[in-house]
Amino acid sequence: MKSNQIRQAFLDYFASKGHQIVSSSSLVPAGDPTLLFTNAGMNQFKDVFLGFDKRPYTRATSSQKCVRAGGKHNDLENVGYTARHHTFFEMLGNFSFGDYFKRDAIHYAWELLTQVFKLPADKLTVTVYAEDDEAYDIWTREIGVPAERVIRIGDNKGARYASDNFWMMGDTGPCGPCTEIFYDHGEHIPGGPPGSPDEDGDRFIEIWNNVFMQFNRDEQGVMHPLPKPSVDTGMGLERIAAVLQGVHSNYEIDLFQNLIKAAARVTNTTDLDSPSLKVLADHIRACSFLIADGVIPGNEGRGYVLRRIIRRAIRHGYKLGARQAFFHLMVSALVNEMGDAYPELKSGEERITSILRQEEDRFFETIEHGMAILEAELEEMAKTGNHVFNGETAFKLHDTFGFPLDLTADVCRERGVSVDSAAFDAAMARQKEQARAAGKFKMAANLEYTGNATTFHGYDTLEAQGKVLALYKDGSAVPALNEGELGVVVLDNTPFYAESGGQVGDQGILKGAEGIFQVEDTQKIQASVFGHHGVLSTGTLRVGDEVSARVDLLSRHRTMRHHSATHLMHKALRAVLGSHVQQKGSLVDPDKTRFDFSHNAPVTADEIRRIEDIVNAEILANTPTLARVMPIDEAQKTGAMMLFGEKYGDEVRVLDIGTSRELCGGTHVSRTGDIGLFKIVSESGVAAGVRRIEAAAGDVALRHIQQQQQLLADAAASFKVPAIELAGKISQTLEQIKALEKELARLKSKLASSQGDELASQAVNIGGIKVLAATLEGADANTLRETMDKLKDKLKTAAIVLASVNGDKVSVAAGVTTDTTARIKAGELVNFVAAQVGGKGGGKPDMAMAGGSDPSQLPRALASVAGWVEERLK
């Protein structure tokens, strides 16, 4: 069966069982800020399962578009190198909302697999939750699966309900056991059945998961039976297609083979097994569907994930020899494959192609220069044996040449090199504000505008009617913007806050009679003229059009919480650290507040706790916020805090929030209680006498605390102790490690001595010099040196090469006794060997070290040492 036939057969089967066929939801989750992208079939039914949404049906089936790239679920780096990792995939599913339950779900699954898809029953193995006797009995007694092929899977050690066969929506809420169906590819494939030590092999592949939501977990962890149990199932189309088409890799199915051939055509590649072609076949699906669902390449959020995927695809095309835009040429092939099932691909083909072409043209301007720098750096590293790529250089590639970090890491990984991501993050943090100023703000400031000012209504409302006063594209005024075009819109009235005072600009939409403009940022073109930056997602927008301007409520509210929390934190910092504390810079956005301030020492843990206590006490007090506009001299008399060096007008806005009083034009909560919660996330130094605090407020703070609690719980579970005993257990373990390392060093020294005695007998006499070349299994550099010294003492007049292999790395040591260095140099000898194993080294005349990356050539290299010495002695 072809992939399209499999998809349709699945939907038709469940339609015949009374299920409503529901179209795939968008890859951009509607109303769920916890998700970056739709990544499961149940996402669109989440509120139905939770009881918040009622549908006219109780049975549903769908083929859901899913993306896993960025955030918690991120398969990007594995795509192209494994048989089953994808950024985009389709999830086939059937769902019961309080209708049928385990018996029908299991019978449906078995009937579809064995009677419709005609899979041999003896090729299927199933798992159930260890305590789910009901599912076990259905499989063994009703379906007739032999007991040895129905495997009970229990909890992970130390964690109740933490099992591959127990599903939970979150820490609380609907949950329940699941049963998974696996296909056995046969004994010729390595791997064991699920639950066995070899379960990670490729022999048994999960093809279908049936989740039985039968409990509601409360905050104390108690399970309460649901009055109407439900069913949520998921089967990857690509996986079942591989099984039905008799291939082992998803990339061998018809759908991918056609896309791989298309990728080969547009890159003029003849090797159809190239991993890079698989990358292109995968990435064209993710990119095209994301653009079809309204995601535009950008520098933040979903837009940046899309840009990363596009640029990773371009890099793989470049690796195949492409030197000009090619990726967009694959869109038509994708539409041919999937356009009937997903009409949005057909209707959006021209727009998708255009946006991809724009991104390609932009990146091809810099990729060659960037790759040259990257390759040169890697070549230098190979010479020195360094295996960690400089994070500052990685940031330069990102900042100057548009190389996402994972693209650089992808190239490095192919050479056995990792990237110093901590140094990259530090460089990013230092330059982020400068990049913002050099990018969006500079672009706004350079626009020429001579019309009327913008009236801001955003203190009182998040929606307003406005008239388009001006439009800009590529920095120039235009009469209209068309679908897919980036631009700037100026309105006479707006609820959108323009970036100022450290607070980022608002996002949202401008809806006209003929078009919708997605506002990605709002910047001031002039003091009282606001530019709405973004893209026209549909239709046309013209100068003079009336629009409905609507700010993204969730984003604005989060920003307001962070801004108000910043004022309270500033006041608390002065109370705890002293009146010398002055603001040196700030950034307030939906995800955090970042606050730079004058202070000469790191803020201690106790001081951080006291600052948090003060702010959270103000939040609990739930006092109203008061904003007043008054003459600046009157504001000074009230004691309002003013920022040193800031320019103020004759009239200023004074904000009272809690015990804080500052001049501020930003947007804020109505009462301190609206902030919800405050938590300091990090504290660091950014310059002499300047410290930086990053903090979170509201739901962002809550998520941070939950993540920290989960990390603590995971660590405690790993050590098999309650969380309260974790610190003591770690200290105990560190002491044990220290003792074991000491014992290991002693044993290595002893081993070196014994190996030296054994190896000495293998030396051959060449021209009066004893020559030895041998491998020491598992030896590190110190062990090689110690063994070398003992051999030199024992052999007296000698030239020695010792090597070891650890993973894909080769370590080589060359030693020459003092009486021989006039004729043979250790550095020359070690480089002779290292060159054959893909490395280079150096050292003193009597001792030198080297590294290599090709262990397969080591035996030949060692065998050639005697001949090299003989040639040197002639």
UniProtKB/Swiss-Prot annotation:
PROSITE patterns for the chain = AA_TRNA_LIGASE_II_ALA (PS50860)
The subcellular localization recorded is:
Cytoplasm
Which SMART domains does the entry link to?
A: tRNA_SAD (SM00863)
Name the cofactor(s): Zn(2+)
Q: What is its EC number?
A: 6.1.1.7
Where does this protein hold Zn(2+)?
H563, H567, C664, H668
EC class name = ligase
Q: Which GO-annotated molecular functions does the record name?
A: alanine-tRNA ligase activity; aminoacyl-tRNA deacylase activity; ATP binding; tRNA binding; zinc ion binding
Domain comment quoted from the record? Consists of three domains; the N-terminal catalytic domain, the editing domain and the C-terminal C-Ala domain. The editing domain removes incorrectly charged amino acids, while the C-Ala domain, along with tRNA(Ala), serves as a bridge to cooperatively bring together the editing and aminoacylation centers thus stimulating deacylation of misacylated tRNAs.
| PANTHER family tied to this protein | ALANINE--TRNA LIGASE, CYTOPLASMIC, ALANYL-TRNA SYNTHETASE
The Swiss-Prot or TrEMBL record describes its family as follows:
Belongs to the class-II aminoacyl-tRNA synthetase family.
Q: Please explain the role this protein plays, according to its UniProt record.
A: Catalyzes the attachment of alanine to tRNA(Ala) in a two-step reaction: alanine is first activated by ATP to form Ala-AMP and then transferred to the acceptor end of tRNA(Ala). Also edits incorrectly charged Ser-tRNA(Ala) and Gly-tRNA(Ala) via its editing domain.
- The molecule here is called Alanine--tRNA ligase
